[in-house]
Amino acid sequence: MAHQQQYIHGRYHASTSGEHFETINPATGEVIATVEHAGQAELDAAVESAKQGQKVWSAMSPVERGRILKKAAELLRENNEELARLEVLDTGKPLQEAIVVDIQTGADVIEYYAGLTDKIQGDYQDLGNGNFFYTRREPLGICAGIGAWNYPIQIAMWKSGPALAAGNAMIFKPSEETPLTALKLAEIFTEAGLPDGVFNVIQGDARTGQLITNHPDIDKVSFTGEVGTGKKVMAASAQSLKQVTMELGGKSPMIIFPDMPVDQAVSAAMLANFYTQGEVCTNGTRVFVHADMLDAFTKELKQRTEAMIIGDPMDMDTQVGALISKDHMQKVLGYIQAAKDAGATLLCGGYQVTENGLDKGAFVAPTVFTDCTDDMPQVRDEIFGPVMSVLSFTDEDEVIARANDTKLGLAAGVFTKDFARAHRVINQLQAGICWINSWGASPAEMPVGGYKQSGIGRENGIETLYHYTQNKSVFVDLNDIQSPY
C-alpha cells in the first residue's frame, strides 16, 4: 500500500499534478500510504471514461447487469477479512465491528440492487380514441459519489449499488482521510466483469470535490458528510442543475420510557453512542431518560461504560478504537471541556487514553454527561465522538417537543413496552430514520435519509432507484395527424 493512484477505466492512472497526500493509521500515527491527488486532468479523464463505460453498461440487458453486480457482492464477501483489516488500518475502528458490518452490509446492498436491475420499469395508460402513453425510467448518466471517512467502503457501496443497477456510471471520491478501500472496491468491480469506466475512483481533498460539483458533464452528486459541507456541495451543484442526494449530520434523540428494562435501555444507549467510537451520523447522542428510572439507568450505564475495552483496533477483543485523527480528537476533547464549563456532570470518561501503548493514537474514553440541559453545547452540536448526554424528562408531550428542538432530523428512537405509545411518539418525531426498541439497524431494503437539515433524498430501498433514474413520457397517437394548418 506504499503508493496509491487514481483508478480510471479499469486500471491505475498516474496523476499529473505531482501533488500527493498521506493517509495515517489513527491508532498509531504511522503513515499507511501516500496517495496521488487528482486535479482537473484526472477528473476529465474519469468523466470521459465514464461516458464510454456508461454507454456500454446501459446497453447491456438488466439481467446481465444484475449478474455482474451479484458477482461483485460474492467477491466482496470472499475478501471480507482482508478488506475489513484494511478498513481498520485507515479508520481506527475495531476489527470486531468492521469484520461483521462494514463490508458485509455493503455487499448486502450490492446484492439487493443486483436483484432489482430487471425490476426498473415504467407505466402505460390507454387514453382512448387511439391514444396512449407510456413512461420509461432511464439512467441519469454519470453520477458522482463523495464519501465520508467513518464507513468508507460501505458508503461507496451504498452509492454505487443503486447507481449502477439503474445503468449509470459512477465517479467516486472517498474522503482524503480514508482513501484506500474504495480502490479495492473498484478492483473487485473490474474482476466481476463491470465494463471499464463504469466505476472510477479519484482521490483528493475538498478541492477535488469542488471540481466534481462544478463539472458540467456530471449529472448527479450523492454526498455523505457534514451539514456545512453539504450545503456547499449543493450550492455548487445548482450551477449546472445537478440532481443531489445529501446524507448529512444528526443530533438524534432516543427516548426511554420507564417500562423499559434498565439493562436493555443501557444496552441501547451504549450502542447508539459508542459504536465506531461515536463516529456515526445516526448516533443517539441525546438520551432522554424518564425521571423514574434515571438513577438506576445512570448507575448501570457508568459501570458498563467504564468496563469497555479500549485498545488496538486489530485485537478482536477491542470494543473502542481510535478516532479518525488527532485533529478530530482535539475537537471532541474541546466539546468535553465545553460541557464541563456549561455545568454538565461528568459521569465517566472524558479524557484521552494514553496507557498501554496508545499514546501515539487518537483514543478518547467513552464519555457520559448527566445533569444536562437542552442548551448545552454538547447537547446542541454534532460532536461525532463517544460523548453521550443524558437528559431527564417526566412528560411525553414535553419530551417530544424537546426531541424535535433541533435543526437536524436524521434519526430518532423510542424505547418502551407500550406499543401504542411507541407508535404515537414515533409519529410525532421529526426524523427520517426511526427505531422502536432498536438502534442502528439499516437493512438494504429500507430507505434511509434525513428530515430538515439532515439531508435530501434517500439511500437504499426501492425508492433510491428513483433518485438515480429520470422519467421519460412517450405519447402515442394511432390516428392521422390533426392540424389547423
Swiss-Prot record:
Keywords: Metal-binding, NAD, NADP, Oxidation, Oxidoreductase, Potassium. CDD domains: ALDH_F9_TMBADH (cd07090). GO terms for molecular function: betaine-aldehyde dehydrogenase (NAD+) activity; metal ion binding. InterPro entries: Ald_DH/histidinol_DH, Ald_DH_C, Ald_DH_CS_CYS, Ald_DH_CS_GLU, Ald_DH_N, Aldehyde_DH_dom, BADH. One of its GO terms (biological process) is glycine betaine biosynthetic process from choline. K(+) 1 binds at T23, I24, D90. The active site is at K159 (charge relay system), E247 (proton acceptor), C281 (nucleophile), E459 (charge relay system). NAD(+) binds at G147, A148, W149, K173, P174, S175, E176, E226, V227, G228, T229, G249, C281, E382. Its cofactor is K(+). Pathway: Amine and polyamine biosynthesis; betaine biosynthesis via choline pathway; betaine from betaine aldehyde: step 1/1. SUPFAM superfamilies: ALDH-like. Its EC number is 1.2.1.8. It catalyses: betaine aldehyde + NAD(+) + H2O = glycine betaine + NADH + 2 H(+). The modification Cysteine sulfenic acid (-SOH) is found at C281. K(+) 2 binds at L241, K452, G455. Dimer of dimers. HAMAP family: BADH. Belongs to the aldehyde dehydrogenase family. Involved in the biosynthesis of the osmoprotectant glycine betaine. Catalyzes the irreversible oxidation of betaine aldehyde to the corresponding acid. This is Betaine aldehyde dehydrogenase. The gene is betB.
